Protein backbone atom coordinates (compact mmCIF):
# COMPACT_ATOMS: atom_id res chain seq x y z
CA UNK A 1 0.00 0.00 0.00
CA UNK A 2 1.00 3.60 -0.51
CA UNK A 3 0.12 6.78 1.39
CA UNK A 4 -0.22 10.19 -0.18
CA UNK A 5 -0.95 13.22 1.93
CA UNK A 6 -0.94 16.97 1.96
CA UNK A 7 -0.35 19.25 4.91
CA UNK A 8 -2.31 22.42 4.25
CA UNK A 9 -1.83 25.62 6.24
CA UNK A 10 -4.67 28.04 5.55
CA UNK A 11 -5.04 31.74 6.21
CA UNK A 12 -7.98 31.09 8.56
CA UNK A 13 -10.28 28.42 9.97
CA UNK A 14 -13.12 29.14 7.53
CA UNK A 15 -10.83 28.50 4.57
CA UNK A 16 -9.67 25.25 6.22
CA UNK A 17 -13.25 24.05 6.71
CA UNK A 18 -14.32 25.05 3.19
CA UNK A 19 -11.40 23.36 1.44
CA UNK A 20 -11.64 20.24 3.63
CA UNK A 21 -15.35 19.88 2.85
CA UNK A 22 -14.69 20.43 -0.86
CA UNK A 23 -11.95 17.79 -0.94
CA UNK A 24 -14.10 15.27 0.94
CA UNK A 25 -17.03 15.78 -1.47
CA UNK A 26 -14.98 15.72 -4.66
CA UNK A 27 -11.91 13.55 -4.10
CA UNK A 28 -12.07 11.32 -1.00
CA UNK A 29 -12.50 7.62 -1.80
CA UNK A 30 -12.37 8.33 -5.54
CA UNK A 31 -9.78 7.66 -8.25
CA UNK A 32 -8.51 4.51 -6.52
CA UNK A 33 -8.29 5.87 -2.96
CA UNK A 34 -9.03 3.07 -0.48
CA UNK A 35 -9.11 5.04 2.77
CA UNK A 36 -8.86 8.64 3.90
CA UNK A 37 -8.37 10.45 7.18
CA UNK A 38 -7.55 13.94 8.42
CA UNK A 39 -5.34 15.14 11.26
CA UNK A 40 -6.31 18.61 12.45
CA UNK A 41 -2.99 19.92 13.77
CA UNK A 42 -4.07 23.54 14.35
CA UNK A 43 -7.08 25.81 13.96
CA UNK A 44 -5.92 26.66 10.43
CA UNK A 45 -4.00 23.49 9.52
CA UNK A 46 -4.97 19.98 8.44
CA UNK A 47 -3.06 16.94 7.21
CA UNK A 48 -5.15 14.95 4.73
CA UNK A 49 -3.93 11.38 4.18
CA UNK A 50 -5.16 9.03 1.47
CA UNK A 51 -4.29 5.33 1.27
CA UNK A 52 -3.89 3.67 -2.14
CA UNK A 53 -3.10 0.15 -3.33
CA UNK A 54 0.17 1.29 -4.93
CA UNK A 55 2.31 4.29 -5.93
CA UNK A 56 0.96 4.36 -9.48
CA UNK A 57 -2.62 4.75 -8.28
CA UNK A 58 -1.55 7.46 -5.81
CA UNK A 59 0.30 9.34 -8.55
CA UNK A 60 -2.75 9.15 -10.84
CA UNK A 61 -4.88 10.49 -7.98
CA UNK A 62 -2.43 13.37 -7.69
CA UNK A 63 -3.05 14.18 -11.35
CA UNK A 64 -6.80 14.37 -10.67
CA UNK A 65 -6.29 16.80 -7.78
CA UNK A 66 -3.69 19.00 -9.47
CA UNK A 67 -6.10 21.77 -10.53
CA UNK A 68 -7.75 21.88 -7.09
CA UNK A 69 -4.35 22.03 -5.38
CA UNK A 70 -3.37 24.96 -7.61
CA UNK A 71 -6.57 26.81 -6.75
CA UNK A 72 -5.91 26.22 -3.05
CA UNK A 73 -2.43 27.70 -3.46
CA UNK A 74 -3.87 30.64 -5.40
CA UNK A 75 -6.10 31.39 -2.38
CA UNK A 76 -3.00 31.78 -0.21
CA UNK A 77 -2.73 28.38 1.46
CA UNK A 78 0.63 26.68 1.87
CA UNK A 79 0.79 22.98 1.05
CA UNK A 80 3.37 20.28 1.59
CA UNK A 81 3.03 16.92 -0.17
CA UNK A 82 3.79 13.84 1.93
CA UNK A 83 4.06 10.46 0.21
CA UNK A 84 5.61 7.05 0.64
CA UNK A 85 5.06 3.34 1.12
CA UNK A 86 2.69 2.47 3.95
CA UNK A 87 4.27 -0.10 6.27
CA UNK A 88 3.54 -1.55 9.68
CA UNK A 89 -0.19 -0.83 9.37
CA UNK A 90 -1.69 -2.42 12.47
CA UNK A 91 -5.24 -2.48 13.82
CA UNK A 92 -6.21 -4.01 17.15
CA UNK A 93 -8.44 -7.07 16.88
CA UNK A 94 -11.16 -5.51 19.01
CA UNK A 95 -11.57 -2.39 16.84
CA UNK A 96 -14.87 -2.27 14.96
CA UNK A 97 -15.64 -0.72 11.61
CA UNK A 98 -18.04 1.65 13.40
CA UNK A 99 -15.15 2.97 15.50
CA UNK A 100 -13.03 3.57 12.40
CA UNK A 101 -15.75 5.38 10.46
CA UNK A 102 -17.35 7.41 13.28
CA UNK A 103 -17.11 11.18 12.99
CA UNK A 104 -15.88 12.93 16.10
Segments (PLM) and residue ranges:
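Short S/T/G/P-rich N-terminal loop/turn motif that feeds into the first structured element of a domain
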Residues: 1-49, 53-104
Amino acid sequence: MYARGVKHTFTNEMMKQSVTNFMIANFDLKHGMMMSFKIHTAENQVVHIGIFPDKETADEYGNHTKQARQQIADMGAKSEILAGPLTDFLISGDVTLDQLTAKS
